[in-house]
């Protein structure tokens, strides 16, 4: 029986056997996976045990309810998978056997999935870039929420997969300068290679002042902040221009005391916006929604306008060692941005 990678409880990664249906429903596909990638920020919150501390989200009251849980264990691990279609349901007309496909799913050698939220890939589409459709969609939502326009100056805090994709999208939007901030040297290097005009090491410096100086003391038109760190949010408020936008998109734990909303924020009156692509309706409803964001990113990937070759690293083999390697890689941001997985048959 095949096995998939799961988080069985907080801080414990292991394997779970699963069984696939013998007969497909009309709208289903049977897929054999070749490559995959993880979603570091969100999954780390649950693997490390702090993702459930706020309780359960109550959809009727639109708030967290203490005492419940957001996700129950075991939690399947893995974010996006690339695979080959082996069988199609009777109602599926947009896929054929041997088509190359991208979809949301867990690390597993095979899967049966619905046809919704799947994307066809060419044989020459790089799998690493394809599996970054998810962080690029999150980044595109943040870029649109920020109101960035051609010629705008932008600061991007935290160069994980989302931040690095935001750098590329800001470049495509014609922003200048694009200033990327992260304490990890290899992430700053990737940002420079993929569109940033300047990078900053935030440790031991006044980042807000540096960003203002880089823009002739005007301040950046928008900030996209994905670290969730109080210090980064404070620097964002210090750096943004009068009336500019600060977009917060991270999923952090509760912050410590000390955020000062009475300094630059009070005088320069920036707009503080929270961004989340999965929270439909979007600010630009009804024209924009999550499905359109994903379709736009898929087109950018297929047109070769996004590049994740230096983002998805390291690439691990789908073997019994993966459970032990998972936590090691997820706990070493200085060595990895977004790790990938290669399955036994990965020729396409």
Q: What feature does the model see in each segment?
A:
Residues 71-104:
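A glycine-/small-residue-rich N-terminal strand-loop-strand element
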Residues 237, 284-348:
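C-terminal hydrophobic helical "lid"/dimerization subdomain
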Residues 18-81:
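N-terminal glycine-rich beta->alpha transition that marks the start or flank
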Residues 148, 194-273:
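Glycine-rich cofactor phosphate-binding loops and adjacent beta1-alpha1 units
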Residues 76, 104-116:
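A structural motif shared across PLP-dependent enzymes of the aminotransferase-like
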